[in-house]
Amino acid sequence: MSDIEARVKKIIAEQLGVEESQVTNEKAFVADLGADSLDTVELVMALEDEFGIEIPDEDAEKITTVQNAIDYANTHQA
């Protein structure tokens, strides 16, 4: 597991109040991890803070799974 992947999974677990072991790459935030719309907004903000990036709304809407978040962080990190 890469450093970025580990950091993303830790943020997701903390933001959604789930065990890190539940945060696997294929999990969807809403369907699998119980996130609501506010959770997803807070999650995007936490990712922005952690990686020093700004995620436009149109991109944020596409980040719906753990793997989406990892890929986005890998591609856009500061």
Swiss-Prot record:
- Give the sites modified to O-(pantetheine 4'-phosphoryl)serine: S37
Query: What exactly does this protein do?
Result: Carrier of the growing fatty acid chain in fatty acid biosynthesis.
Q: Where in the cell is it found?
A: Cytoplasm
> Where do the coiled-coil regions begin and end?
none
Gene Ontology MF terms: acyl binding; acyl carrier activity; phosphopantetheine binding
Pathway(s) it belongs to: Lipid metabolism; fatty acid biosynthesis
Provenance organism: Comamonas testosteroni
Matching HAMAP family: Acyl_carrier (MF_01217)
As for family, the record states:
Belongs to the acyl carrier protein (ACP) family.
Asked if Transmembrane is a keyword of the record, the answer is: no
| Superkingdom per UniProt | Bacteria
Which SUPFAM superfamilies does UniProt cross-reference here? ACP-like
| Keyword Iron-sulfur attributed | no
The family database entries (InterPro entries) matched by this protein are listed as: ACP, ACP-like_sf, PKS_PP-bd, PP-bd_ACP, Ppantetheine_attach_site
Coarse class of the protein's main subcellular location: cytoplasm
Record-level GO BP terms: lipid A biosynthetic process
Q: Which residues form the Carrier domain?
A: 2-77
Q: Which PANTHER family match?
A: ACYL CARRIER PROTEIN, CARRIER DOMAIN-CONTAINING PROTEIN
Pfam families linked? PP-binding
Q: Know the name of this protein?
A: Acyl carrier protein
Q: Which UniProt keywords apply?
A: Cytoplasm, Fatty acid biosynthesis, Fatty acid metabolism, Lipid biosynthesis, Lipid metabolism, Phosphopantetheine, Phosphoprotein
What Gene Ontology cellular component terms go with this record?
A: cytosol; membrane
